[in-house]
UniProtKB/Swiss-Prot annotation:
Lineage: Bacteria, Pseudomonadati, Pseudomonadota, Betaproteobacteria, Neisseriales
Gene3D superfamilies reported for this sequence: 3.40.50.11270, 4-hydroxy-3-methylbut-2-enyl diphosphate reductase, catalytic domain (3.40.1010.20)
Organism, as annotated: Neisseria meningitidis serogroup C (strain 053442)
GO terms for MF: 4 iron, 4 sulfur cluster binding; 4-hydroxy-3-methylbut-2-enyl diphosphate reductase activity; metal ion binding
Keyword Iron-sulfur included in the entry's annotation: yes
Catalytic center residues: 129 (proton donor)
Listed EC numbers: 1.17.7.4
Catalysed transformations (reactions): isopentenyl diphosphate + 2 oxidized [2Fe-2S]-[ferredoxin] + H2O = (2E)-4-hydroxy-3-methylbut-2-enyl diphosphate + 2 reduced [2Fe-2S]-[ferredoxin] + 2 H(+); dimethylallyl diphosphate + 2 oxidized [2Fe-2S]-[ferredoxin] + H2O = (2E)-4-hydroxy-3-methylbut-2-enyl diphosphate + 2 reduced [2Fe-2S]-[ferredoxin] + 2 H(+)
Keyword line: 4Fe-4S, Iron, Iron-sulfur, Isoprene biosynthesis, Metal-binding, Oxidoreductase
Entry keyword Cytoplasm: no
InterPro entries referenced in this protein's UniProt entry, alphabetically: LytB/IspH (IPR003451)
Protein's name in the database: 4-hydroxy-3-methylbut-2-enyl diphosphate reductase
Gene label: ispH
Role this protein plays: Catalyzes the conversion of 1-hydroxy-2-methyl-2-(E)-butenyl 4-diphosphate (HMBPP) into a mixture of isopentenyl diphosphate (IPP) and dimethylallyl diphosphate (DMAPP). Acts in the terminal step of the DOXP/MEP pathway for isoprenoid precursor biosynthesis.
Functional pathway: Isoprenoid biosynthesis; dimethylallyl diphosphate biosynthesis; dimethylallyl diphosphate from (2E)-4-hydroxy-3-methylbutenyl diphosphate: step 1/1; Isoprenoid biosynthesis; isopentenyl diphosphate biosynthesis via DXP pathway; isopentenyl diphosphate from 1-deoxy-D-xylulose 5-phosphate: step 6/6
Cofactor, how bound (note): Binds 1 [4Fe-4S] cluster per subunit.
């Protein structure tokens, strides 16, 4: 034993929303056969998407690419009202793989709009979840802020009829700063009934923060277009620890580990455990012999499939409590 240790973050990897979204595509392929069309990558992970593509899933961005009467699945990130309307007009058989926690934000937007509140969204411009959430209302009806600096530039109709919602995969710490700035500038702004950042994002960021405090280097398994995976790397780096994000083990560089005794490994919510194990095997070959699991929050949430795709024993409620 050389004292070189790998610590695995807990929790890590797939969350309930990702599990559900992947299962919807797989079950639809089993029930209806290929091809099954999916608007956008069902989750942001190359390995997962490539695997589903091999099984017969076709990933598209424009509904014009989908033939009449075909089966269409919305990605876990959600879609706008305009996309839903177009899908209905084209007569597709639709299954909605939107994460229920994203759907919760969509419902909050509808409720606030019905109360004539102007809504601010905290999120990253261009991210598919942000496009879907802001697309719950007509273009221009919601305001987007990405940074604390954006808050000072906001022009609102009525500061007393104002509310905010958040993208579910943001940095917990950075979002707190933006929320503080919003509350400072608009004292009467309405906060969500419950934090929009999802339990899995929060738990994984807490775990990687603890990991970074113990380790000399942190490896995050996740694809470059995965928001929550990028945030994990940023959180670890923010502690002052060397942090790298890799899509799979082939992206690892041996030089990163020179002089590093403790290596932390985690994975974004859309990264499968098989990729973590491949990363682990590579690092072990390079001399880190001891592996141990870190401690963290236990997760037992399960989101069930749409009723049309459920099998015997797969019943409501949608949310099984932790």
């Amino acid at each position: 034993m050389n004292g070189k240790t790998i610590i695995l973050a807990n929790p890590r990897g797939f969350c309930a929303g990702v599990d559900r979204a992947i299962s919807i595509v797989e079950r639809a392929l089993e029930e209806f056969g290929a091809p099954i069309y999916v608007r956008h990558e069902v989750v942001h992970n190359k390995f997962v998407v490539d695997n589903l593509r091999e099984k017969g899933a076709v990933f598209i961005e424009d509904l014009a690419e989908v033939p009449p009467g075909a089966t269409l699945i919305y990605s876990a990130h959600g879609v706008s009202k305009a996309v839903q309307q177009e899908a209905a007009e084209r007569g597709f058989r639709v299954f909605d793989a939107t994460c229920p926690l994203v759907t919760k934000v969509h419902k909050e937007v509808a409720r606030l709009d019905a109360q004539d509140c102007e809504i601010i969204m905290i999120g990253h411009k261009g991210h598919v979840e942000v496009e879907g959430t802001m697309g719950q209302l007509a273009p221009g009806k919601m305001l987007l802020v990405e940074t604390v600096g954006d808050v000072a530039k906001l022009e609102v109709r009525n500061p007393d009829k104002l509310a905010y919602v958040s993208q579910t995969t943001l940095s917990v710490d950075e979002t707190k700063d933006i929320i503080a700035a919003l509350n400072a500038r608009f004292p009467n702004i309405r906060n969500p009934h419950k934090e929009d950042i999802c339990y899995a994002t929060t738990n994984r960021q807490t775990a990687v923060k603890e990991l970074a405090e113990q380790c000399d280097i942190v490896i995050v398994v996740g694809s470059p277009n995965s928001s929550n995976s990028n945030r994990l790397r940023e959180v670890a780096a923010g502690i002052g620890t060397d942090a790298y994000m890799v899509d799979n083990a082939s992206y690892l560089q041996r030089a990163w580990f020179e002089g590093k005794n403790k290596v932390g490994v985690t994975a974004g919510a859309s990264a499968p455990e098989v990729l973590v194990q491949e990363v682990l095997a590579t690092i072990r070959r390079w001399g880190h012999e001891t592996v141990r699991e870190g401690e963290g929050a236990e997760e037992s949430i399960v989101f069930v499939l749409p009723k049309e795709l459920r099998r015997e024993g797969e019943t409501k409620p949608d949310l099984c409590k932790r």
